[in-house]
Amino acid sequence: MPASASPSIAGLLLAGGRATRMDGVDKGLQLLDGTPLALHVLSRLSPQVDETLISANRHADRYAELGAPFDARIVADETPDFPGPLAGLLAGMRAARAPLVACSPCDTPYLPADLVARLQAALDAQQADIAMAVTVDAQHVRSPQPTFALLRTSLADDLAARLAAGDRKVRAWYARHKTVEVEFHDERAFYNANSWQELAALARR
């Protein structure tokens, strides 16, 4: 993209959580096959977007180092109490130069290579505010994946108001806006690590 061009989609890596089920470690910095989880995700997400942001509330210098090959910028929550992914999303929406933000957790190393394109196609086709991934397994069970989404940055003020009111649930906030669900049939692409056991399992997949 030429330096003078305006980016159309920002990618946002959500790495600002507390990882309470992993003894509070910084999940994105844990290694899979010798590489930090966050770098696995950045390597898949950044080629799909025009600018890259990393939501990180700890170890900002380390994330800046990981993000340097992608010209990533670091953003932090506006509040210090780790209020959850919506706070990271808000920080990214505020910082983005693009009108759309595509978000992904930092612990999903098999992120689909066509995630953003498919979300954008659905968003445009339905003239929606938010496009959210949904996995469908072999038994046709649908599982929403709300932290894999494409959102309009114009929603930032509403999100800020809901966070100020104490709302923390991602899907509850999505329900306030026109949201389209996009089905993905490759469950493996959305596997993540919420525990040490799941991190070990990722290495075996």
From Swiss-Prot:
<keyword id="KW-0501">Molybdenum cofactor biosynthesis</keyword>
<feature type="binding site">
    <location>
        <position position="107"/>
    </location>
    <ligand>
        <name>GTP</name>
    </ligand>
</feature>
<keyword id="KW-0808">Transferase</keyword>
<dbReference type="Pfam" id="PF12804">
    <property type="entry name" value="NTP_transf_3"/>
</dbReference>
<keyword id="KW-0479">Metal-binding</keyword>
<keyword id="KW-0547">Nucleotide-binding</keyword>
<dbReference type="GO" id="GO:0046872">
    <property type="term" value="F:metal ion binding"/>
</dbReference>
<dbReference type="GO" id="GO:0061603">
    <property type="term" value="F:molybdenum cofactor guanylyltransferase activity"/>
</dbReference>
<keyword id="KW-0342">GTP-binding</keyword>
<dbReference type="GO" id="GO:0005737">
    <property type="term" value="C:cytoplasm"/>
</dbReference>
<dbReference type="GO" id="GO:1902758">
    <property type="term" value="P:bis(molybdopterin guanine dinucleotide)molybdenum biosynthetic process"/>
</dbReference>
<feature type="binding site">
    <location>
        <begin position="14"/>
        <end position="16"/>
    </location>
    <ligand>
        <name>GTP</name>
    </ligand>
</feature>
<feature type="binding site">
    <location>
        <position position="27"/>
    </location>
    <ligand>
        <name>GTP</name>
    </ligand>
</feature>
<protein>
    <recommendedName>
        <fullName>Molybdenum cofactor guanylyltransferase</fullName>
        <ecNumber>2.7.7.77</ecNumber>
    </recommendedName>
</protein>
<dbReference type="InterPro" id="IPR013482">
    <property type="entry name" value="Molybde_CF_guanTrfase"/>
</dbReference>
<feature type="binding site">
    <location>
        <position position="77"/>
    </location>
    <ligand>
        <name>GTP</name>
    </ligand>
</feature>
<dbReference type="InterPro" id="IPR025877">
    <property type="entry name" value="MobA-like_NTP_Trfase"/>
</dbReference>
<keyword id="KW-0963">Cytoplasm</keyword>
<feature type="binding site">
    <location>
        <position position="107"/>
    </location>
    <ligand>
        <name>Mg(2+)</name>
    </ligand>
</feature>
<dbReference type="GO" id="GO:0005525">
    <property type="term" value="F:GTP binding"/>
</dbReference>
<comment type="subunit">
    <text>Monomer.</text>
</comment>
<keyword id="KW-0460">Magnesium</keyword>
<comment type="function">
    <text>Transfers a GMP moiety from GTP to Mo-molybdopterin (Mo-MPT) cofactor (Moco or molybdenum cofactor) to form Mo-molybdopterin guanine dinucleotide (Mo-MGD) cofactor.</text>
</comment>
<dbReference type="InterPro" id="IPR029044">
    <property type="entry name" value="Nucleotide-diphossugar_trans"/>
</dbReference>
<comment type="similarity">
    <text>Belongs to the MobA family.</text>
</comment>
